[in-house]
Amino acid sequence: MTDLPFVTADLPGSGGALRRAPEDFRVDEVPAYLPSGAGPHLYLRVEKRGRTTRDALRELARALGVPERDAGAAGLKDKDAVTTQWLSFPVARDPDPAALAAPGLRVLEVSRHQNKLRTGHVRANRFTLAVRGGDLARARDCAAALAARGLPNFFGPQRFGAAGRNAAVGRALVTGERSPEAGRAARDRFLRRLSLSAYQSLLFNRWLAERMADGRFAAALAGDVMKKLDTGGLFTCEDPATDGPRVERFEISPAGPMFGHALRLAGGEAGAREARLLEAEGIALADFVRGGGEAEGTRRAARLRIDVALEPLEDGYRAAFELPRGAYATVVMRELTKADAELPEED
């Protein structure tokens, strides 16, 4: 992410080291809904240390006597952290939580619900991170600036794969360029979707970086597709003088392009900016039909409200904050520390 701008570029970072131990990085999943307490699906809220979500699903499905494919999770969490989340299983009986305990895995709550948990059934993630050797006073200045200016909703480096290879393969799929990696991705639906998504994310980051460089990060442009931050609804900006103050109040945000063949188009000045980005890439929206037509296109908020709580540690500080699904803690910590680090986030 070294080529991306900071919204707090005028402030020095705290420095410090992230993630020296799993306990230094905690992620608590905030579900889209809570289990009702009744229904055919057993819901378990679990805490994991040094285990991935798939590890936990496999272990618990085996203990409960159900196929792993029938287990459900709203999101995948990395093993190099302490994480909590709900998992679901089609089990009629209520088990003893203690009997399900395993190394690095314990059950915190048991409930039931009518449906299986599925990918995306999550509202947000709550992060708690220790920054060893970080300067708390500097972190506080950066956190205050973020609260006032907003968080640029960049994709983190996890999205792009080692050395950005996933995005490069995605571009090859869109342009029709032939390569062994693109050939493999074209035949494998998982790799194809991963690569196309990485390329869409790369273009979004470029769009947002240009917007920040032009001083339009917290502004509404004529023709912008805008996103309501409370409901996710989209509309087109017709009067920047009316919508601009709403952007400043974090009611709405410009919604940047995740380019695809069926993308909702921006108009006016905003549409012209997006068209120039595509032209510079040498592609058109119709090119995204390649690769199976799965890259339909969508819109992503450019700017998020962020409230970072800080507290001192003997050797640094602890930062806690909540982000909506799809936003990256890496981006927050980069603003606070002014250092690039890849955190073990869901992706």
Curated annotation (Swiss-Prot):
Its EC number is 5.4.99.27. The active site is at 78 (nucleophile). GO terms for molecular function: RNA binding; tRNA pseudouridine(13) synthase activity. One of its GO terms (biological process) is tRNA pseudouridine synthesis. InterPro entries: PsdUridine_synth_cat_dom_sf, PsdUridine_synth_TruD, PsdUridine_synth_TruD_CS, PsdUridine_synth_TruD_insert, TruD_catalytic, TruD_insert_sf, TruD_pseudoU_synthase. Signal peptide: none annotated. One of its GO terms (cellular component) is cytosol. It comes from the Bacteria. Pfam families: TruD (PF01142). It catalyses: uridine(13) in tRNA = pseudouridine(13) in tRNA. Residues 150-304 form the TRUD domain. Keywords: Isomerase, tRNA processing. Responsible for synthesis of pseudouridine from uracil-13 in transfer RNAs. Belongs to the pseudouridine synthase TruD family. PANTHER family: TRNA PSEUDOURIDINE SYNTHASE D. This is tRNA pseudouridine synthase D.
